[in-house]
Amino acid sequence: VLGGENAYLDPQAVRRETTLISSVVQRFHDVPFLAWDLINEPSFSKHLWQMRPNGDAFERAAWNRWLDARYPDRALLADAWNMPFIGPGATLPVPEEAEFQLRGMYTGPNSLRLYDFFEFAQDTFAGWVKNLRASIRATGSQQLITIGQDEGGFDDRLSPAFFGPYVDFTTNHSWWQNDALLWDSLVAKQPGIPMMIQETGLQREMTLDQIARRTPENDAALLERKEALSFVEGSGAIQWLWNANDYMTSGNEVPIGALRADATEKPEATVLRDMAHFAGEIHESLRNPEPADVAIVTSQAAQFSAIREMQIAAQRNAVRAAAYVAKMPVSVIAANQVGKMGTPKLAILPSAQALADSTWDALLAYVKLGGNLLITGPVERDAHWHRVNRAAAVGLDGATVEPLTIHNAEMKVKDETISLSFGFDAQTWLDTFQFKDGQQLKELAAGNGHIFWAPYPVELAEGEAAAAKLYSAVFSEIGLSAPFELKSAPAPGVLIYPTVLRDSVLYVMVSERDQDYDLELVDNTSKGELKLRLPAEHAAMALIRKSDGSITAKYGF
């Protein structure tokens, strides 16, 4: 819109952007309750909603400057990329399309440049955000600043794990990943920064003959689950948009909104009205949330690679296994944020396969200070997928890395045998450990803490049962129990997620099953009791006062 070859790197484009934003902010810098969203659902380039090079001269020059700063010795760069040495001053091209594909190495160059390109893109965008923030603050504005990112920002696009220091709150737009809505909230939250589900709602899903798949009641139930889960690690949600969207030209976006074109209400309107009432009752208590006892650590080395979708699958399965099945609240920490992780009672590194040295060092520092770390599968590759010897370095002798080539496996954890099944992708791309004394969970002392190491990439086995059993065993070993006592029988597909606040405990309860569930529990913090019928596919919430265990606000029952 403002011209230029590259929105983030062309000096003329950046100058115009800065002038536009400064001019608008100057006019409205004292308006209360106004926030600045610098860009909506950003991609790094002209290739919308994917991470690909733009291919312009500004990008190429910036890419080479970034490489020179990261790798002053070109020999180290050649080694990292498995390429012939290219002397100083020579221009290095950005990655080709084939390098982003799973089997690109069969037809073109390897994909080892991807990790650096992803980091370059993240650093470049973070710098752009930093500069615009400075321009806004120069006007005297103290209004909140954010970036409205969608779920792709937690896959392979621009991530608040990098630009987070330059915004006042992070966001996610929970549109499509309806089976990973808890993950949506957890990955958007960055250490020390508030998070909001800034856009949520229902886009139309149709059958092959162009009939809407969901009924209005289905839509309302899904919206209810999305709104409820926005209170996990977050400060709520905004439905985009709350009224009607009839002037959109996109067929799947026209139906968005709680009102129809004739201004009659959909069932979603009742959800919004009731949610607003509940939020008004609890807002004074939504302060000083205690961090979860368990932190799931991502691998950006794997996520910024050609097999990135497998790392995303591992994260989502880890979240579901821990929170839904093992009933343990968790947080998710990006690899480059591990230094800000704090002191959870357990950190889980799920099926990473590869990991940057800096992340590994930060995890070991956490363990040596008394932390517990669970690792599943080998992590014997660095950020460029070169072999390293991390297991031996921490005392795990006799562990050999082998390609995972089997469908079925068994792993012994104390007196229990955990069965695992691996599909085609796992058999094609993953490594596993062979321990010299059998396939069992290893426990290693490191400083004041402990490392638990499982031989298989458990989170990339089919289903979440294997990971949940492993997690439960480790929880028991370190004396970690769920923050509530469940009196009713556990039910698959039901999430019970408590957050301990300054004066209360907030319970978010979500059903993703086909039958109602009679839920009964005792909260360990307040000794308060919850007893309700959770309808199939719906959500409920309750705020329990710490001092006497009474329910001071509730939704859905």
Predicted segments — roles?
Residues 2-23, 27-166, 182-184:
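Polysaccharide-binding and catalytic clefts of secreted carbohydrate-active enzymes
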Residues 9-20, 59, 69, 117-128, ...:
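Soluble or luminal CAZymes and related metallo-dependent hydrolases
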Residues 29-35, 72-73, 140-144, 167-168, ...:
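Loop/turn elements at helix/coil->beta-strand transitions in domains of secreted/extracellular proteins
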Residues 42, 201, 243-246, 378-383:
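Short beta-alpha junction loops
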Residues 148, 154-318, 405-417, 430, ...:
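Hydrophobic targeting/anchoring helices
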Residues 150-159, 320-341:
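A short, well-structured beta->alpha microelement
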Residues 171, 342-353:
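Short, well-ordered secondary-structure micro-motifs within conserved domains or adaptor modules
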Residues 219, 350-557:
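A conserved amphipathic helix/loop scaffold
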